Every structure is written in structure tokens, then in C-alpha cells.
Amino acid sequence: FKDASVDILNFIQCTLRINPDEFDFLGGCDGLDGVMMQLGAVGCVSFMAVPFPKEMKDIVDAGLAGDYKKCMEAQHKVLRIRNLCKQAPFNAAWIYAMKYGGGPVGMHSRMPKDQDFVPEMLKTQLDDLAKEYGYDVL
């Protein structure tokens, strides 16, 4: 079950009522996946994993290992990315950032043209952060 509700109390209530040997929870919000791993999630389904796969994998690996400190350090790295991406409409910044992960690059979302706009200053900030995190920026 993927929980992208950002409702931590609901997530904990669900974990209270299931057998974790028979039912897996996945985090579904880039801003909370580290916390959800600490609360019993076994992984995450994340749009952020396309442009920044290493950072999302670091959250999951540290969470599965029970390393709270590393998990939250990885979560904080992702929050820096997310805080920038949230400055553009809809998912335009995530689509722009897909070039960092080495996978297919999205051209446009299904949203109107004005919803695909990423300001040049934001592109520069994303590129700078990607460089800081060790990604090749074209």
C-alpha cells in the first residue's frame, strides 16, 4: 500500500492494524519518505526517484537498516530538492530535473503550457544543487 496522504497519524493507525509480515507499506511523499521508513514503511514510490535516484535510495537503504541519523540526513537532502521543485507550477521542475537521473527526459506534462514553466533562476538553482550532489549537469 502506497501512502501519499502526508497524514502520519493515519499511517501509524494503519500500521497498528496490519501484520507487517503479510502487508507492506510504501511511502509516497518525497517530503516524508524518511519519516515513513522509520515508522515501518519498506520502501517508497517517488517521482523524485526519477531525477534523483541516489538520494531516494539512500533514504530507503538507511531506513531499512534502522539507521535513523542517515535516513534523516538523506531526507534533508531530498527536502532541499523538493523545496526548489515546489517553486514551479505543478510538476514542471521535476520534469526539468529528470535530466539528472540519466533516464528518459520528459518534455511537457499534460498540463497547460503555463503550468510547464520553470523560471531560469530556478533552473540554475536546481542545476547547482544537482552539481553539489554529484550529478552531471548538461
Which residue stretches match the model-derived regions?
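C-terminal alpha-helical cap/extension of soluble enzyme domains
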Residues: 48, 52-138
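Catalytic alpha/beta core domains of metabolic enzymes, predominantly
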Residues: 2-86
